[in-house]
UniProtKB/Swiss-Prot annotation:
SUPFAM superfamilies: lambda repressor-like DNA-binding domains, Periplasmic binding protein-like I. This is HTH-type transcriptional regulator RegA. Residues 5-24 bind DNA. Keywords: DNA-binding, Transcription, Transcription regulation. It holds the Pfam family LacI. It comes from Clostridium acetobutylicum (strain ATCC 824 / DSM 792 / JCM 1419 / IAM 19013 / LMG 5710 / NBRC 13948 / NRRL B-527 / VKM B-1787 / 2291 / W). GO terms for molecular function: DNA-binding transcription factor activity; transcription cis-regulatory region binding.
């Protein structure tokens, strides 16, 4: 039979209340007593009844992390940052991969409600209105990472970078290198609450601010995989000669480079290419990819710290963090 809290108290020769204080890290217990209790716990192989504890405290010390695509290189570092912080504060994590499927998003939100999680870190390429409503109906602290809602006083707390400004800087970087036929391969800007969609706005503004006309023949919208970069560039180069490409993520950029190579176009001799994210393979791909670096680990850790503060009724210093980004210069630009 499994040891109970009474058994631990008897073994350590303390009260049940003292054992409870030790388990809950209450500071009033002196070190000698705490040591005796911990030795008794180890000797008896005591495991607290999590279900009973959660019913009493209305806390499970569990946080749900929802990501849109576990196969993407972008999200693991965010999850690592979030999980490292959750471990510091003794929270467990439930990881939910939605595969960019809205029905799976809905299912996981229901699962997290059933699991009585204390909070949710939510990542999604596009926050559909019904998903936002389901998250609100949870009535559980929720922080959005990588994306945010439109400006609203009731918007969920968030951690992002300024994607439009980062894109603007990337395109300006290409223009300063003498390029003026700059293609764009990315996500349809009409998608609402989509972090990648607004990258196009930065691309467009940089061109217009430099008196470069917007050429629809140089623009292709699609998904966020390498094949989308390959397909997009194959369409563009059949219509126009280009001297640069800006892509909404590194995977697209790598697919674009492959398409250029297959068509006898050298990168960077003939065409400069800039990506977005600075995923691991961007530094080992050939040529090494010039890209916008998102602080993925920090996005996860900042998001988790903010969430835990909200769970514990503390006021975060900020509800909408916009973190810094960098242009990482490598070999895909002259």
């Amino acid at each position: 039979m499994a040891a109970s809290i009474k058994d631990v108290a008897r073994e350590a020769r303390v009260s049940i209340a003292t054992v409870s204080r030790v388990l809950n890290n209450v500071d009033v217990v002196n070190e000698e007593t705490k040591k005796k209790v911990m030795e008794a716990i180890k000797k008896l192989d005591y495991r607290p009844n999590i279900v009973a504890r959660s019913l009493k405290t209305q806390r499970t010390r569990t946080i749900g992390i929802v990501i849109p695509d576990i196969s993407s290189q972008f999200y693991p570092e965010i999850v690592r940052g979030a999980e490292d912080v959750s471990n510091i504060y003794n929270y467990n994590v439930i990881l939910c991969n939605t595969d960019l499927d809205i029905s799976k998003e809905k299912d996981y939100i229901r699962v997290l409600k059933e699991k009585m999680v204390d909070g949710v870190i939510y990542m999604s390429n596009s926050l559909a209105p019904e998903i936002l409503q389901l998250l609100r109906d949870l009535k559980i602290p929720t922080v959005l990472v990588e994306t945010r809602e439109s400006e609203d006083e009731n918007a969920f707390p968030s951690v992002t970078i300024d994607n439009a400004k980062a894109a603007y800087d990337a395109v300006n970087y290409l223009i300063k290198k003498g390029n003026n036929k700059i293609a764009y391969v990315g996500v349809n800007p009409k998608l609402k609450n989509n972090a990648r969609a607004i990258i196009y706005e930065g691309y467009k503004k940089a061109l217009l601010d430099n008196n470069i006309p917007l050429n629809e023949n140089l623009i292709q919208f699609g998904g966020l995989k390498a094949i989308d970069g390959t397909d997009g560039i194959n369409v563009i180069i059949k219509k126009e000669k280009i001297d640069a490409v800006f892509c909404a993520c590194d995977e697209i950029a790598m697919g674009a480079i492959n398409a250029l190579r297959e068509n006898g176009i050298d990168v960077p001799k003939d065409v400069d290419v800039v990506g977005f994210d600075n995923i691991y393979t961007s530094s080992i791909f050939y040529p090494k990819l010039t890209t916008i670096e998102q602080p993925t680990y920090d996005m996860g850790s900042v998001g988790m710290r903010m969430l835990i503060k909200i769970i514990n009724k503390a006021e975060p210093e900020c509800l909408h963090y916009v973190l810094d980004y960098n242009i990482i210069e490598r070999d895909s630009c002259k």
